[in-house]
């Protein structure tokens, strides 16, 4: 294992302070360097006969938090996967488009008729570098703690590369990792792993620039986004995505129908399969790791959706619905699904099968249209698996709290345990300005029941294009939701994080509390603002301004036992 020096890179983004160091954990099967953060604690904490003077943390920031890294956004991040791609021998140069990557690499694809997907290799019994990488990440160097930990009579085992392989082979987990995204630090999405979160970014016809979107993508990674979706619908969609990909250490997803629509001047009726196919190939060669494709909305579902309070709220779904009505034909993303899968398996692109008929209001939740489409998504999942294509299923939406659990039950039944990826769900329709909290409430419950990844919502949801601070708020709130779900599922590393935080709080170890929080910047700032007279001596205070020195329950509790 190698460790970087002091965390000085990008001081304005030095979120975690000098107690946090970037470290790299070596692989045992492959020449891997798996990035994590290590927090040095102010004291040693003893929990279940294990002692901790430092805590390794799961880290999504890539090289951006490494002071030794030489970051040049013009050139992109280092191509770390080039040295360990097992699929290389099964590939050939790709000439499907005129795309020229910023990093100068020649795009590659599977040999004619071949497959290079993680599922294909997993089903052949091969443990790939990506599988070992994500196993190391999930364990956070805490294998000994995981084996000792028990709760409610349940015991646990560390994640192994073989376990990851088996989950991917079964379709219960995916590793989104296009062979043309060599800058990627692989991660896993599945109900038997840490709950992940996705951050949406992207320009619109009314705002933002390439620079702003790249900055938002990096910002989201720094705050903890496990994946990022570029949902650009404005100008320069292709160039924006290229800059994001070359500087992204996390998987990047897109909705290709947006760029296809741009090519026909925004006129949905003029879309064709050929235009869409060419768009898939362009994005595949760029390195997009997963596509949201709305193949499950069928023309027979449209009359049912028309009776809803809020109709079709999916942008991609509304585009396809308009095309189907105009041409009086079936959705071409459904009729050409086999051809789509052939493209996906050639580049190892996962498919997020889109829920075009997700409810956009609680009145429409769990209705006939939503569940009819969900059954179709299950059928498409089986078809994609015939091609060894990795699949996750998109979910709602707006769902009142009492109907949330049914979504998970039906998804597991209809979609054969493929990972569930949901936008919330939002549990009320009146949260404008606070819909990130609204989303996190439903997301926490759904993730505790088995949802694998939560798509964040920002405070600007339903109101406008989010800026950097909105991205930060959305990421932090959904990290909180994901972590709460991990606790409910008994995740040992999540419980350790909470238990050390609680012990630090009881012992008034303020710096440890800041460093262990999801937003150390805000925690440190608000604590110091509440006691400005203490200055740098805040560690000596055994109370906060909420209760003061005479009414602090923890202080009194300690005094009572002395």
Swiss-Prot record:
Q: Which cofactor does it need?
A: [4Fe-4S] cluster
User: Binding residues for substrate, per the UniProt record?
Assistant: 200, 229, 258, 294, 314-316, 355-358, 394, 421
Q: Which residues participate in Zn(2+) binding?
A: 398, 462
Biological process GO terms, please? thiamine biosynthetic process; thiamine diphosphate biosynthetic process
Listed pathway(s): Cofactor biosynthesis; thiamine diphosphate biosynthesis
| Ranges annotated as biased composition (Polar residues) | 85-100
What superkingdom does the record give?
A: Bacteria
Pfam families documented for this protein: ThiC-associated, ThiC_Rad_SAM
What ranges does the record give for the region Disordered, renumbered to this chain? 85-105
Q: Which InterPro entries match?
A: ThiC, ThiC-associated_dom, ThiC/Bza_core_dom, ThiC/BzaA/B
Binding locations of [4Fe-4S] cluster: 544, 547, 552
* One GO CC annotation: cytosol
Membrane-crossing residue ranges in chain numbering: none
- Name one molecular function that GO assigns to this entry: carbon-carbon lyase activity
Give the record's family classification.
Belongs to the ThiC family.
**What HAMAP family would the database entry show?**
ThiC (MF_00089)
Q: What is this protein called?
A: Phosphomethylpyrimidine synthase
Species, as recorded: Prosthecochloris aestuarii (strain DSM 271 / SK 413)
């Amino acid at each position: 294992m190698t460790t970087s020096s002091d965390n000085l890179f990008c001081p304005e983004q030095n979120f975690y302070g000098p107690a946090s160091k970037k470290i790299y954990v070596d692989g045992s099967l492959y020449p891997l360097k798996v990035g994590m953060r290590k927090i040095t604690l102010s004291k040693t904490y003893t929990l279940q006969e294990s002692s901790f003077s430092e805590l390794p943390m799961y880290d999504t920031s890539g090289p951006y938090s490494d002071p030794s890294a030489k970051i040049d956004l013009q050139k992109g991040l280092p191509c770390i996967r080039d040295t360990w791609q097992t699929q290389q021998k099964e590939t050939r140069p790709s000439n499907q488009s005129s795309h020229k990557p910023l990093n100068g690499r020649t795009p590659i694809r599977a040999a004619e008729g071949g497959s290079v997907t993680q599922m294909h290799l997993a089903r052949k019994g091969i443990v790939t570098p990506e599988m070992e990488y994500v196993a190391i990440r999930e364990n956070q160097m805490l294998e000994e703690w995981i084996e000792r930990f028990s709760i409610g009579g349940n015991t646990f085992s560390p994640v192994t590369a073989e376990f990851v392989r088996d989950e991917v082979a079964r379709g219960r987990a995916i590793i989104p990792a296009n062979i043309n995204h060599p800058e990627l630090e692989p991660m896993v999405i599945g109900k038997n792993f840490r709950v992940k979160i996705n951050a949406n970014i992207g320009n619109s016809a009314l705002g933002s620039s390439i620079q702003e979107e790249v900055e938002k993508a990096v910002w989201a990674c720094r705050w903890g986004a496990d994946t990022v979706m570029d949902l650009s619908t404005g100008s320069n969609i292709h160039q924006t995505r290229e800059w994001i990909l070359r500087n992204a250490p996390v998987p990047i997803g897109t909705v290709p129908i947006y760029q296809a629509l741009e090519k026909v001047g925004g006129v949905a009726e003029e879309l064709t399969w050929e235009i869409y196919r060419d768009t898939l190939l362009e994005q595949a060669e760029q390195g997009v790791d997963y596509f949201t494709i709305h193949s499950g909305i069928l023309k027979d579902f449209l009359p049912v959706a028309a009776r809803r309070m809020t109709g079709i709220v999916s942008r991609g779904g509304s585009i396809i619905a308009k095309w189907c009505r105009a041409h009086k034909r079936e959705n071409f993303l459904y009729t050409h699904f086999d051809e789509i899968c052939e493209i996906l398996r050639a580049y190892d692109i996962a498919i997020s099968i889109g829920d075009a008929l997700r409810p956009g209001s609680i009145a429409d939740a769990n209705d006939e249209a939503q569940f009819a489409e969900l059954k179709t998504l299950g059928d498409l999942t089986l078809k994609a698996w015939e091609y060894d294509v990795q699949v996750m299923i998109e979910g709602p939406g707006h769902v009142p709290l009492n109907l949330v659990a049914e979504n998970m039950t039906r998804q597991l039944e209809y979609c054969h345990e493929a990972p569930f990826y949901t936008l919330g769900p939002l549990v009320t329709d009146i949260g404008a300005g606070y819909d990130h909290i609204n989303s996190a409430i439903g997301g926490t419950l759904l993730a505790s029941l088995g949802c694998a990844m939560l798509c964040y919502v920002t405070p600007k949801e339903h109101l406008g294009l989010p800026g950097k601070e909105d991205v930060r708020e959305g990421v932090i709130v959904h990290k909180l939701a994901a972590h709460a779900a991990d606790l409910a599922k008994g995740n040992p590393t999540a419980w350790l994080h909470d238990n050390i935080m609680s012990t630090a709080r009881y012992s008034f170890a303020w710096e440890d509390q800041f460093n262990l929080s999801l937003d150390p910047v805000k925690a440190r700032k608000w604590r110091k603002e509440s006691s400005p007279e203490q200055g740098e001596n805040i560690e000596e205070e055994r109370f906060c301004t909420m209760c003061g020195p005479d009414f602090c329950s923890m202080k009194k509790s300690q005094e009572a036992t002395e």
